[in-house]
Amino acid sequence: MSLQNSHSKKYVLTFFMSTCLLTSSFLSTSARAASFTQLANQIPTLSGLSEVQRKQKWNSYTLQEKQEAWRRAKLTPDFVQAMIDMQTGFTESDLSSRNNKTRHKAREKKSELDLYIAGTKQGFKEKVDGYISQGKIPTPEEAAQNLEIDYDAKKTDNKLEKNQNVRRVEKDKKALLDLYIHSITTSVKEKEYITTGQVPELGELEKALNISKEEAKHRRTIIRDQVMANERPKLVRSGTVLTKKELHKRFGKDTTTDDTKYIDDITTEVMYTKKQGYVNTDFLPKISEIMNEFKVDKGRANLYLNQIKAGIEAKLLADNNQTTTKPFTKHSRTTTNTAGISSGVPFDTGRTKPETKSFDFKRSMYSLLNRKQEDQLSKTEQHLKQQIKLEENKEEFKEILTKNPIDALLFAEQSNLGNSFKQEAISNIDLSKDISRILFTVDDKGNRTILNTILTTTPEHKDELIKQAQHHAIQTLPTSISDKDVSDKKKLTLATLAATEDKKVLEEALDNWLSTNGYKRKPEVESLISILLSDETTLKAGIDKIFELPVENNVNNNSNKGQNGTPILPPTPPLNGSMPPSPPPPLLNGTPTSTAFNNSNPNHKFDLKNFEATYPRLYKSYNEFIQNTTSASQSQATTTSNNIPDTKAKMGESLELLKQKVAKQNEVIGLIHNEVTKLYNFSPKTFVNLFNTENEEIIKKIEQIAKREDIQKILQDNDIKITSTFVSKIFNESLEQTKQRLRSSNIINAKQYKRIEQYANKQECVTEFLRITNPLEQLKFANKYINILGQSTFNGKLNELIENPNKLTFSQKINFVLQGYQELTREIPTAKANLNKLKQNILEKIEIQQLIANKDISRKDLLDILNNKNPELLKSLLEAKVILEENKLNNSANEVDLKEIIPSLNYLTSEQLTSLINRITIEGVKTALKAKWQQENKTVSNNTEKPLIYNNGTPMPPPIPNGNSNFGTNDYLISMGYTQEFIDRMDKVKPNNNFGKNHNYTATDFKSNVGKNYYESTSKLGGTDILLTDSQKLENAIKKEVLAKYIEEPNRDMQDDSLLKQAFEEKFYYAEDKNTKVIPKPSEVNFDPNFIGPRTEVGQEIYELYEQELLKLARDPVFIEYVKNNNNTQKDERELLISFIEQIESKRPELEQKYGSDVQSEDNNQEKKVGHLNMKQFQSLFQQENESANDESSTKDDPQPEDSNKKSEKSDSETALSPRLLSSNDSKNDKSSDDKKSLLVLRSSEEESKKDIALESEDEAIDMSFKTEAIAEQDEATQRQQVSDDTNRKVAILVKATSTLHKPVHYNILSDRLKVAAIGAGDEEASINRGVWISGLYGINKQGTWKNIPKYQGRTTGVTIGADAEFINSHDVIGIAYSRLEFQIKYNKKLEKTAVNGHLLSIYGLKELIKGFSLQAITSYGHNYIKNKSKSINNIIGKYQNNNLSFQTLLNYKYRTKYDLHFIPNIGFKYDYSRASNYKEYNVDIENLMNQKKSNQSFESSIGGKIVFKPIATVNNIILTPSLYGNIERHFNNKNTKVNAKATFKGQTLQETIIIPKQPKLGYNIGSNILMSKKNINVLLEYNYYTHRKYQSHQGLIKLKVNL
């Protein structure tokens, strides 16, 4: 143990030193590692804040903004600060963890932190941007050079580098390089998508970027939003309004994006653009036209139409505008659209009338009232005068609106018109054209009248105004910035707007301006540069001020604004020591100067270093400009009176004065800090927190101190006033500043300072503790700093987790149980009792379902968790595992009731239980149980000296001293209650761990041909197969065997060679995906057992053969053992093959049910005969792709194997042939004695045992007839087997056929009786309408192979006659019908054909209910019978009768839409009861076959609908009414059925149990019909299609009805 600990310590020390060296390589640049405090002191927005405010502000930054801040400061964060910046946890010890998952996660986190640190260095961003702009991906060598690390890929190979520590360090470097390259690759790919305007599919993005699905969703959303934003102007210009479906087709779907808003915005812009066209042409579109063109609802279309009408009306009023001397009444024309909607303008006569003079009452009254003084008017007269004036203002507003909407808005504001008029004016303003006037029109007081009016009236226009203003600024700034006629305020406003959208526009405009010799002023330039250097918060505050919006509580948001609301930043200090013009120092009382460019902000310094680092090219231009400006100002200082003052020209002197002023302020602030501190009694908490936040109490004390004479004198001498700004600086003291001030003062002594330092350290620890989000990491942190935080913090957190373990995530719970518990108990042995409680509570909260679902948990970890959680459960799992392994070993298909073995897990599904058991191994469970037993044994032996007792009462042997004893290896299992018999069973099924050493396999050990061929290919030491992987060899072995089975059919033509090559070599598809989507071969991706060929007829047959081979593999325990324990296979290949084995084992029950009776065990001791197939032709199908060109030639040269097939048929009679081959031989010639020699193999013991399984359903008796001449010469065992096989097939077919026989009749009786239009009053000649009708039915049916139902084809014919009466007033119907049906079933030629005859009597009715509802019902009684007579020598007579009673009801609702289209949804229910009679059969060989009388019932529900189109009138008064219908059926009470038959066969009694699978749960029905009516004759033509799993039915119907 001590040796192990020493090695562990040595390893940790070595690894820690390696990690330090690696980290230092990243930090070995010109920049030095720094703390956050050093950085914050250099950031203007952080330097004036308290420590808490700094961290809050810093945490609001994005990672890119944080990296930019470090770069500007030319500092590099240390590793701990990087973790704080990224808000991620990282534990150094995880890098040396034995758990691969933990180690890999730690490596990923470390690479992210290292890349973040590298991103803060100078030049890093420029290199990355260079790669992205060029669309280039760096090589690993270039990445290592850029990151300044020394990486050697060879050192990651354990064969070349034996030192594990060196390997892990190199792997850490590789992880960093991979992350660096991946980030650039992602950016390049995103840029490519955005540039081309393509939105990738999610799967494509996952594959292209090699990222997770969640990250791919996020990336795709970013790409999609950007592409949609780029396409928006094009859509608006083209007038294209997209629907959601069109939008999704063009850009794809994304649930996180508000597509409705995007479409609505485009629609609004397009409608606004087209509105003026309607107004100019005096055209009023229809409501329907607006709805169709812009895809809007009726309400919005009405609103849009009203706007057009208002615009036309205003235009007409403007055209007919008259002077005040003309009569008040105006003549105009009115336009009316095709819908009859008037434009609303009066006096439309249709012709021009001569203008006439008329008396204007309003004008005359207003003139009369205007002659009087205001004090002479009565209240009524005053009101009347105001109303007349208001009417005049409205008329004048409309006239102005047609000419200039902005003037109309100002007029409405001045005339006090209502908001409706202002809104109308605003709706007519073209923001893209008039934004300049809106922004820069001010009144005498400097207020933006137009802008304020718009925002006050319609605040919802705010975002659009800001957007248009930014767009306008970007367009006009390059020309405005160099125009001396443009005011300073306007330039600053444009610069602020442009910078918020794209700072590059401002940068390029400044650079071009400084590079020219045109007009420019230094204050103006420096103010614009200050805007360029401003952060987002300052710029946002500037935007809010421009638009007079509420400004957020940003730092210095008031003192940093000019008169026009633009944020003004201080000018830059001189570069060359000269004295260029400089602004005066800031006023302490916060009063701004009068010049917009001369405001200064002491908290926002103009940092030349920052300027140079961020914009080097612009900095160079600015430097040249400063030098030229300085020279010019010095030469002209005495020649003109308009020169800049000397104080401004001497920026250096001014700056020095400013520094002195600030230094004096800081001294005064420190003095006030100390004086206030002296007023309080000593308390570490009080002294530390005194100036971190403002409070009224301290402010009052500051005011008291400021009134003292000594303080007053100091303030006056230094020209300092106590303003709110000055007070805010007093409360900006950080924790470090507080400690430094108190340490250097005489307020406290050394002992008191030590207490303050302890308290401050505790505060920092508490802050860091609260920052940690992982509760377990908090627990470790509290233990690490327990001397500072105290024992109570640790105990409190531990008790909190004990009470509520769900605060931990699932992964955190697992990590604690497996690792965290051991680490904490080792570090904190005193807390072991509470840690045990926490562990037990966590284990109780871990659900078994979670363990099953989480595939990342290793097998060992899973067993450890289960062993800790419930050892008894592990014992039950061991029992189940042994039983399942025994079944596999014995090739048994008996289903095991896992829930009975493990009753404690009966809440799990069978699939979950199987998955859990498959993930464990017997040896793994034994190891876990042994470890648990040894732990308990050690605990007991330490606590007591009493002898240990077994569960059975026998004394337990003493503990094993030092591992050397004769103690039995399995005695611990006996002590746990296992018997020796069970232990022996475990040993039998235990896999061979010495595979390849002590066990020598031979080809004859394998039961399947595929297994034998695979073994031979893997055991070869040479040949062409040496280049293939083991999974490719297994793939080829399966292909060859499937092909051999396919070709062995005697009637198979080898011309199918091209189809087989296509099925095997070119295309592979997954069974779940039935479409034609091509995917790579399984050997290239994963060896999934569900790959199949193309879904053609050949492909389907190949797929069935393929599944049969999978079943044979699942029955071959030697093959499974060989694959699972073959240590010679590479790790990745072995995992791939084991995954394949697990999948076919899980599919085995399904395959047994589907092919159990057909698949035979292959005798590997004899050579299997498949005909003398030419091996060249056989091998040509499996050559590599580069040899595919030779396939056709080799195939064409080989002869067809007809003769060899004949020889094969006459060969050894013991050769096992498939049922398909036998049926083909029998059908070829019934009289051929050679064909009769073919034998059927008895079904396996698994198939026999399946008959004993209890089924849910009731029994059903079915008639059977057998053909005997084909088995006359076979032995009795084979004959019995053939009887069983034929019985299974035919019973399954007949049950399936009779279940759907009456379905088309039921559906078609009332399909045309739902009335969709009311009869007019003049048509009601009789109260009852009687009629007779007749219909003919013809249908074809096809059933594919499904479970144990073989494929067959059928034909249905039938005739139905009926009569009914319809009550005209209520449309109710009642009637009766009789149907005669015949169903011809054709399966293989061996079983001949069967005819099912049926008679059906139905009573039906239809009742109209309220509000469009109707109810229809059909009750039917049917009688079916089967009578077969074969044409062979030995007749078999089989009689069968079946009576059926069914009831079906359907509730309909008729809904009429536009264009006389009727939609009729419906929901229905059906009940069916059937009863079969006893029957017997007689023939030569089967003397007596009897089935008992049985009954069965089923339930079915349906939901669907019908669409009836508008009737069409044709020539000769024939009315055509087409319709479509469809529904979905759901079967209930759906159970398997078994048929028990008892037969006397050649003197022996045979019993046969036939399993009929339950129907699929869902069925689908769709159809269409057309009703032709003329007078009292109706003719209905109908087509119907019905389908469910592997079953299809097509029916055609013609129906004639005559109304009497």
From Swiss-Prot:
What compartments host this protein?
Cell outer membrane
| Sequence ranges of Basic and acidic residues compositional bias | 1193-1213, 1227-1240
**Which parts of this chain are annotated as the region Disordered?**
324-354, 554-603, 1183-1240
Give the matching SMART domains: Autotransporter
Please give the PROSITE patterns that the UniProt record associates with this protein: AUTOTRANSPORTER (PS51208)
Please note every region of biased composition (Pro residues).
Answer: 568-587
Q: Which UniProt keywords apply?
A: Cell outer membrane, Membrane, Signal, Transmembrane, Transmembrane beta strand
One Gene Ontology term, aspect cellular component: cell outer membrane
Name assigned to this protein: Putative surface cell antigen sca2
Q: Tell me the name of the encoding gene.
A: sca2
